[in-house]
Amino acid sequence: MAGAKEIRSKIASVQNTQKITKAMEMVAASKMRKSQERMAASRPYAETIRNVIGHLALGNLEYKHPYLEERGVKRVGYLVVSTDRGLCGGLNINLFKKLLADMKSWSDKGVETDLALIGSKAASFFGSVGGNIVAQVTGMGDNPSVSELIGPVKVMLQAYDEGRLDKLYIVSNKFINTMSQEPLIVQVLPLPPSDDSELKKKAWDYLYEPDPKSLLDTLLRRYVESQVYQGVVENLASEQAARMVAMKAATDNGGSLIKELQLVYNKARQASITQELTEIVGGASAV
């Protein structure tokens, strides 16, 4: 059995770690609330533009934009949204596992894949396991802006415009609630028609100013940018929630470990006292 002094040192070490994890839990809780506010603020715009674009996909368009047309699939692209920091449980690895499975399903069909990575964890992971990385951005912090995402989005849209990509997906975590985050792979190009059954019963006709091509070119790019940004802010809220839960679990585990060490310390202390008493009694008997 370890000595009492050594056990006291272990208890102190765990208590110090527990203070750190508790502080990180509180910081994550505060950041999560702010992330939820940003997510809630941007979600109506993202959903509205998605609905408008869904109407366009179902409508009788004067000009058929390339982003609305299905074509033979030889290469697909993924915009992968991850975190810049760790200590958030299995948030990133669960997302990467889902993505790898999807990439394998395309690979089995002879389709190649390109990756545009957002977040240092994705860059580190795919730098290790391999993958055709065509763009990446890291270090966006806790308050990302659309302008910071333009680089990877532009690279993927240019590849799609030039026919080097035939499908484009966003890979990110959707914030369900504090205890639940869902990894999602969502197709953004070509634009999938709305799955709303009510919309499919209606015919949508639009008048365009100044003309369909210039308006759709701008609108569809804004649509892609808005979906990527929404994916980033949802992923950020998911990150803070996962980190808060992970740090709470670590704090609770630290408390359990301290109790166990305290019992071991008490037993060691009791054994030490018993030994001292035995030595005293033995010494007195010898005299």
Curated annotation (Swiss-Prot):
Keyword Membrane tagged: yes
Coiled-coil region list: none
Sorted UniProt keywords: ATP synthesis, Cell inner membrane, Cell membrane, CF(1), Hydrogen ion transport, Ion transport, Membrane, Transport
Pfam families reported in the protein's UniProt record: ATP-synt
Subcellular location: Cell inner membrane
Gene Ontology CC: plasma membrane; proton-transporting ATP synthase complex
Molecular function GO labels: ATP binding; proton-transporting ATP synthase activity, rotational mechanism
Membrane-topology annotation of the record: Peripheral membrane protein
DNA repair as UniProt keyword: no
GO annotation terms (biological process): proton motive force-driven plasma membrane ATP synthesis
SUPFAM superfamilies linked to this entry: ATP synthase (F1-ATPase), gamma subunit
Binding partners and assembly: F-type ATPases have 2 components, CF(1) - the catalytic core - and CF(0) - the membrane proton channel. CF(1) has five subunits: alpha(3), beta(3), gamma(1), delta(1), epsilon(1). CF(0) has three main subunits: a, b and c.
Family: Belongs to the ATPase gamma chain family.
Function: Produces ATP from ADP in the presence of a proton gradient across the membrane. The gamma chain is believed to be important in regulating ATPase activity and the flow of protons through the CF(0) complex.
Name listed for the protein in its UniProt record: ATP synthase gamma chain
Organism: Pectobacterium atrosepticum (strain SCRI 1043 / ATCC BAA-672)
Lineage: Bacteria, Pseudomonadati, Pseudomonadota, Gammaproteobacteria, Enterobacterales
Gene: atpG
